[in-house]
UniProtKB/Swiss-Prot annotation:
Keywords: Disulfide bond, Secreted, Signal. This is Acid phosphatase-like protein XcAP-1. Gene3D superfamilies: Phosphoglycerate mutase-like. One of its GO terms (cellular component) is extracellular region. GO terms for molecular function: phosphatase activity. Belongs to the histidine acid phosphatase family. It comes from Xenopsylla cheopis. Lipids and biogenic amines bind independently through different binding pockets.
Length: 374
């Protein structure tokens, strides 16, 4: 009996050896019915903002929850996933994104019956939190002209990127005349729309060859990474608010308090935030200053581009009263997890060092509103 007890005790100690205390997950929402993105070219003549999740999108969201449970349930010491106590699903205010985060929660709980559930307005509304709407401010020219102004200073480099895929873009334009070959956002958003069409309407998408899509993806990756990382101002305006909100929450957790607004208070161990692709990119930009590594290699735009099923996990550890942070990135549903390391940090970065490395990108909502206009 003593030996059995010792073995059980050793197993408990091993499972708690890394002392994982909390995980923030930012995930790209699941696949949805193809539509035209705001700011992009008219390809389908139906707005993407009204599109609902496809069956594949629901499956992706559920599988993410299942995967997160396998990864973190034991490590976090959670006996049962429950959105009122042990985890908090949040999302941007688009209905499909809210549905996506709730289905990810169903995946955590292992509840298949919720995959096709008709969610009530109350359930959808419960996925929002106060700071959320400000995160998208930077991409709205009327609310943040400074971001566009800063981006336009990079015109020369943007032109170089556009030349790299000009023949592919011309091919797309021959099919969809609304594509403006000189607008970088048209290239990226056209690629994202075409990718959905290729998957959802394969018979009418045979002209979209693998080489064409690969070339458009490469350009989209370079455009979006440049647009969020080329200068400190771009990093700050695109991802600084997210960073500020996360640091506020992380500060509370390192002081032994609950994540603010989490329904479960101190019992809450996991926060799932489902967002649009551009916010995953801007979060990565704010979390990866110059010199950061992805699996100990230099970062390329192509490696970082978030596909369907992508998510960033911020793991918070406490060892001997000292807190550290580990960043894990999965760039798509079939991709392996990669560790992000900041300059001067090991895989796990002491919390104060982590904060100090990113401090210059952090910005409050009030400061952000001013910086957007000045």
């Amino acid at each position: 009996t003593t030996i059995i007890l010792l073995i059980a005790f050793a197993a408990i100690q091993l499972s708690k050896a890394d002392d994982l205390k909390f995980v923030f997950v930012m995930a790209r929402g699941g696949d949805f019915v193809a539509g035209d993105y705001a700011g992009g070219p008219k390809i389908i003549n139906k707005e993407a903002k009204d599109s609902e999740l496809t069956e594949q999108g629901k499956q992706e969201a559920f599988q993410l929850g299942t995967k997160l449970s396998e990864l973190y349930k034991t490590k976090l010491g959670v006996s049962k996933w429950d959105s009122k106590t042990t985890y908090w699903p949040v999302a941007l205010s688009q209905k499909r994104t809210q549905v996506s985060t709730l289905i990810t929660g169903a995946g955590l709980e292992g509840d298949q019956s919720k995959r096709n559930k008709a969610w009530t307005n109350e359930e959808l509304k419960a996925t929002s939190f106060p700071a959320m709407e400000s995160f998208s401010r930077f991409i709205k020219p009327n609310e943040c002209p400074k971001y566009l102004e800063e981006l336009m200073k990079q015109k020369q480099e943007i032109s170089t990127i556009l030349k790299e895929c000009s023949s592919s873009v011309q091919q797309v334009k021959s099919k969809y005349s609304a594509v403006n070959v000189n607008l970088p956002q048209h290239i990226w958003l056209a690629y994202e729309t075409l990718k959905k069409l290729k998957r959802q309407q394969p018979s009418s998408s045979t002209w979209m060859t693998d080489d064409l899509m690969k070339n458009l993806r490469e350009c989209s990756a370079k455009i979006t990474w440049l647009a969020t990382t080329k200068t400190d101002t771009l990093r700050k305006l695109s991802g600084g608010l997210l960073l500020n909100d996360l640091f506020n929450d992380m500060d509370q957790i390192t002081q032994g308090k609950a994540q603010p607004n989490a329904p479960g208070g101190k019992d809450s161990k996991l926060n799932v935030f489902t967002v649009s692709q551009f916010l995953v990119i801007s979060q990565l930009a704010a979390f990866m200053p110059e010199g950061s590594k992805l699996n100990n290699k230099a970062v390329t735009a192509s490696d970082i581009y978030p596909e369907d099923g992508s998510h960033v996990d911020i793991e918070m550890y406490q060892e001997n009263n000292k807190w550290s942070v580990k960043l894990v990135y999965v760039s798509g549903k079939d991709k392996q997890p990669q560790t992000i390391t900041l300059p001067g940090c090991q895989e796990k970065c002491p919390y104060e060092q982590f904060k100090s490395a990113l401090q210059k990108y952090k910005i409050t909502d009030e400061e952000h509103q001013k910086a957007c206009k000045n």
